[in-house]
Amino acid sequence: MGGISIWQLLIVALIVVLLFGTKKLRSLGGDLGGAVKGFKSAMSSEEEKKAIEDSASEKTAQTEEKKTESKDKDKEQV
């Protein structure tokens, strides 16, 4: 009632196969799979890039702290 039954889905799938053919659907599935794979690799490379930027900014902050500490020590010695 109000929902799509399994039989309706099967009939729609059968009509789609008859209209497009299995070769066309197979190539479409391959294209879709390639797009998903490309999207996943782009997302993972973006995460790696962000992690590298975070570690670089932490190293920069640590370097600046060390410079500040060494300047303070130099002032104390004078």
Swiss-Prot record:
Pfam families: TatA_B_E. The chain crosses the membrane at residues 1-21. It is a single-pass membrane protein. It is found in: Cell inner membrane. It comes from the Bacteria. One of its GO terms (molecular function) is protein transmembrane transporter activity. InterPro entries: TatA/B/E, TatA/E. Its main location: membrane. Belongs to the TatA/E family. Part of the twin-arginine translocation (Tat) system that transports large folded proteins containing a characteristic twin-arginine motif in their signal peptide across membranes. TatA could form the protein-conducting channel of the Tat system. This is Sec-independent protein translocase protein TatA. The lineage of its organism: Bacteria, Pseudomonadati, Pseudomonadota, Gammaproteobacteria, Alteromonadales.
